[in-house]
Design a protein with these regions (language model features):
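Extracytoplasmic/periplasmic, Sec-exported soluble proteins
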Residues: 2, 35-39, 94-96, 121
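Short, gly/Ser/Thr-rich active-site loops of penicillin-recognizing serine hydrolases
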Residues: 122-141
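Active-site-proximal alpha-helical segments within enzyme catalytic domains
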Residues: 35-56, 100-117
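Active-site Gly/Thr loop motif
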Residues: 17-23, 65-119
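Sec/Tat-exported extracytoplasmic proteins
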Residues: 10-18, 41, 48-55, 71, ...
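Structural helix-adjacent loops and short alpha-helical linkers that scaffold large soluble proteins
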Residues: 1-7, 54-62
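Non-transmembrane alpha-helical segments in soluble domains
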Residues: 7, 11, 45-52, 68, ...
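Active-site helix/loop module of the DD-peptidase/beta-lactamase fold
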Residues: 1-34
């Protein structure tokens, strides 16, 4: 099961404080791998920190390089690679289906988690949110 693999390979290794949940496609069904992973903000931050650090705790150096280097430009002119968005050079951004964000700024040694419950039709809002997260990250240092 996907949830068991995720627990063993990531959740336990980052030292998550809380159990996470994953929506399934039906009663006793399979996890929706494309979405619907639910966790506490501090545990999302742990994942962001682990991916941003040089530690191979949850991902190899080559996998981290793949995540951090956009291969295509998509919406808003952002780069994209392997489920990771790149709204600005050097910035990594994981986005959930309804407004969950894990923003990584290695230059400022910052990870910001933003949890939301937004409609999927909130077009254009991600660009504004990324801009605010960038401003917060740059001002904190």
């Amino acid at each position: 099961r996907l949830a068991d693999e995720f627990s063993d390979r990531i959740w336990k290794k980052v030292g998550a404080d809380y159990n996470a949940t994953w929506n399934v496609d039906k009663v006793n069904g399979h996890e929706k791998a494309f979405c619907c992973f639910n966790a506490a903000a501090r545990d999302y931050a742990r994942v962001g920190l682990a991916l941003m650090s040089g530690s191979p705790k949850i991902a190899s150096t080559s996998w981290k390089a793949r995540l951090s280097n956009p291969i295509v430009n998509l919406d808003y002119g952002w780069g994209y690679a392997a489920q990771m968005w790149h709204p600005y050079p050097g910035i990594n951004l994981m986005m959930g289906l309804h407004g969950q964000y894990i923003y990584q700024d290695p230059l400022h040694d910052t990870v910001i988690v933003k949890l939301s419950d937004m409609p999927t039709s909130a077009d254009g809002i991600s660009d504004k949110i990324a801009s605010v997260l960038r401003e917060i990250s740059e001002k904190k240092s």
